């Protein structure tokens, strides 16, 4: 499957409703501050410019700190040596967001007679969080687990990475890939059993296609301004740009926030949101991982909430958009990957990628025995 030389078209197996697309052409030209985003436009002109900038930078810095992992993880599989069971706060959180492994029987009981669709984040979910984003390699046993899941259920990778890059990590042609936080979606090869009958060509949907020149331009600007900050890296993910500060000294985080904010002053159609030790510069359109999940479900003909159980597993703030969609639809389960208590829209939790793999293997065994 060639993931690099496709044109931005939709070849839909089912009719895609205008309500789902949300009038994308008008949104592409519209500017508005999105929830969870920070922007330099639309402020009260009577307020001091410097004061506005300071408020923006401090708000972004607070978000950076709140999204930072509080424990040093073992790069082997995201494990650490502390005991969550001894932490009262963690125990209280687990009561609200219980283990998906311990609750597996309950999850599959609700799926009896229904179709399951599986959605997976990549970094921190299928691969460990590592200092160098280019080395977030998926293990062979995890790849085998995902491949087996895709044999029985429609399966998609929904990542902030570019679609091409996440495919290079996963290397499975039988999956759907939604890169750039769902702004770059491609179906698997047409011969795969979960591909729709009408999908004789590659399904490609890119709601932010018009932003490509702007993303390239802002990438160059960001590379230039953070080049003097030790540990800061910039990653062009095609329809969004990631500014990684995982390896930046905490004393320099405010400088990173300030420089990113200053760059975005020249790009009012872009916004910045925070992820796990990363700032994400994205187009200001009404599209996110939640919208991508809805689009994929409809494209697959799995939009019937009465007969479909979507399962979404992810570890980042951007995955909350997908968790929220599943809650609002009152259908399916969001599963947060975390070793620390977090505010979340997810129903269940898993500690790390090793537990994610165990859960995926559980799903496969359950399906084999239920056939």
Swiss-Prot record:
Expressed in roots and shoots. It holds the Pfam family Trehalose_PPase. Its EC number is 3.1.3.12. Keywords: Hydrolase, Stress response. InterPro entries: HAD-like_sf (IPR036412), HAD-SF_hydro_IIB (IPR006379), HAD_sf (IPR023214), OTSB-like (IPR044651), Trehalose_PPase (IPR003337). Induction: By cold, drought, salt stress and abscisic acid (ABA). Its cofactor is a divalent metal cation. The keyword 4Fe-4S does not apply. One of its GO terms (molecular function) is trehalose-phosphatase activity. Optimum pH is 6.5-7.0. GO terms for biological process: response to cold; response to salt stress; trehalose biosynthetic process. The keyword Phosphoprotein does not apply. Pathway: Glycan biosynthesis; trehalose biosynthesis. Removes the phosphate from trehalose 6-phosphate to produce free trehalose. Trehalose accumulation in plant improves abiotic stress tolerance. Over-expression of TPP1 increases trehalose levels and enhances tolerance to salt and cold stresses. Belongs to the trehalose phosphatase family. This is Probable trehalose-phosphate phosphatase 1. It comes from Oryza sativa subsp. japonica. The gene is TPP1.
């Amino acid at each position: 499957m060639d993931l690099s030389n496709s044109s931005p078209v939709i070849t839909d197996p089912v009719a895609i409703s205008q309500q789902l697309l949300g009038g994308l052409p008008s949104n592409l030209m519209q500017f508005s501050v999105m929830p969870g985003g920070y922007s330099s436009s639309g402020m009260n002109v009577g307020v001091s410019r410097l004061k506005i900038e300071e408020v923006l930078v401090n708000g972004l810095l607070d978000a950076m700190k709140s999204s930072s992992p509080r424990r040093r993880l073992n790069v082997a599989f995201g494990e650490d040596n502390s005991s969550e069971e001894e932490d009262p706060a963690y125990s209280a959180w687990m009561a609200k967001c219980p283990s998906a492994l311990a609750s597996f029987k309950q999850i599959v009981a609700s799926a009896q007679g229904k179709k399951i669709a599986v959605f997976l984040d990549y970094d921190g979910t299928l691969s460990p969080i590592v200092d160098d984003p280019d080395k977030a390699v998926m293990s062979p046993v995890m790849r085998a687990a995902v491949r087996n899941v895709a044999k029985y259920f429609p399966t998609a990778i929904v990542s902030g990475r570019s679609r091409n890059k996440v495919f290079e990590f996963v290397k499975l042609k039988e999956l759907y890939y939604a890169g750039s936080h769902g702004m770059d979606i491609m179906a698997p090869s047409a011969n795969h059993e979960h591909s729709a009958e009408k999908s004789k060509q590659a399904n490609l949907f890119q709601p932010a296609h018009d932003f490509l020149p702007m993303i390239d331009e802002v990438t160059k600007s960001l590379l230039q301004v953070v080049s003097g900050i030790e540990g800061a890296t910039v990653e062009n993910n095609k329809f969004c740009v990631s500014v990684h500060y995982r390896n930046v000294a905490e004393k320099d985080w405010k400088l990173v926030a300030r420089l990113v904010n200053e760059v975005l002053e020249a790009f009012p159609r872009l916004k910045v949101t925070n992820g796990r030790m990363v700032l994400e510069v994205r187009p200001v359109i009404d599209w996110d991982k939640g919208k991508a999940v809805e689009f994929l479900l409809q494209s697959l003909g799995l939009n019937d909430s009465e007969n479909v159980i979507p399962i979404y597993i992810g570890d980042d703030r951007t995955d909350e958009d997908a968790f929220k969609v599943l809650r609002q639809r009152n259908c399916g389960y969001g599963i947060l990957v975390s070793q620390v208590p977090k505010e979340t829209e997810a129903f269940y939790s898993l500690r790390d990628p090793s537990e994610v793999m165990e859960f995926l293997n559980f799903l496969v065994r359950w399906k084999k025995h239920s056939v």
